[in-house]
Amino acid sequence: MYLIPTVIEQTNRGERAYDIYSRLLKDRIIFLGSPIDDQVANSIVSQLLFLAAEDPEKDISLYINSPGGSITAGLAIYDTMQFIKPDVSTICIGMAASMGAFLLAAGAKGKRFALPNSEVMIHQPLGGAQGQATEIEIAAKRILFLRDKLNRILAENTGQPIEVIERDTDRDNFMTAQKAQEYGIIDRVLTRLEDK
């Protein structure tokens, strides 16, 4: 278990204590720093919707340090990023792997970044099935459908041909921040916040 830091803010009406994530949200910063499951996706989606309703013209920054996770949960975040009016800028800190890399590439064009020592990893969806042969067949068809959908979206977001995406996601494919820029997952490597 880890401790969530609290920030004390002085105002003319006194002191106010925020958990760090609530304080960042005031500056339109969302932090994805865990594996992606339904609970995490619901939190990210609700923050995106809140910020979009609060000011539909102002960018939102999504900082990503995630090993990936559930495809359906990740697609809920992805669809919301595309659905809302504000641009969502994505910034990789540490690692953006699997669905984390998918979301990194889904940021607004020209506003996708990574810090110099961060790492990006893309691969095909993982899954397993057990049970009767027909259940295994259904699961296999679904994972192939999801793989094709994710590859198509990743090709659109990176500018890579679908054949290149299919080849490069066949196994775990790790990239430095610089390589992720060359590949089209990000637009620029940031060394200072002002560079953004």
Curated annotation (Swiss-Prot):
The record's GO CC annotations read: cytoplasm; endopeptidase Clp complex
Under Enzyme Commission nomenclature, its number is 3.4.21.92
The places in or outside the cell where this protein is found are: Cytoplasm
Q: Which domain of life is it from?
A: Bacteria
Q: Which reaction does it catalyse?
A: Hydrolysis of proteins to small peptides in the presence of ATP and magnesium. alpha-casein is the usual test substrate. In the absence of ATP, only oligopeptides shorter than five residues are hydrolyzed (such as succinyl-Leu-Tyr-|-NHMec, and Leu-Tyr-Leu-|-Tyr-Trp, in which cleavage of the -Tyr-|-Leu- and -Tyr-|-Trp bonds also occurs)
Q: What is its main location?
A: cytoplasm
Pfam assignment, any one: CLP_protease
Protein transport listed as a keyword: no
Which molecular function terms from Gene Ontology are attached?
A: ATP-dependent peptidase activity; ATPase binding; serine-type endopeptidase activity
Q: Which cysteines are joined by disulfide bonds?
A: none
Q: Which UniProt keywords apply?
A: Cytoplasm, Hydrolase, Protease, Serine protease
SUPFAM superfamilies, per the entry: ClpP/crotonase (SSF52096)
Active site per UniProt: S98 (nucleophile), H123
Coiled-coil features, chain-numbered ranges: none
Question: One biological process GO term for this chain?
Answer: protein quality control for misfolded or incompletely synthesized proteins
What general EC class does the enzyme of this chain belong to?
hydrolase
- Record's subunit section: Fourteen ClpP subunits assemble into 2 heptameric rings which stack back to back to give a disk-like structure with a central cavity, resembling the structure of eukaryotic proteasomes.
- Function recorded in the entry: Cleaves peptides in various proteins in a process that requires ATP hydrolysis. Has a chymotrypsin-like activity. Plays a major role in the degradation of misfolded proteins.
Q: Which family does it belong to?
A: Belongs to the peptidase S14 family.
Q: Per its record, how is this protein called by name? A: ATP-dependent Clp protease proteolytic subunit
Q: Which gene encodes it?
A: clpP
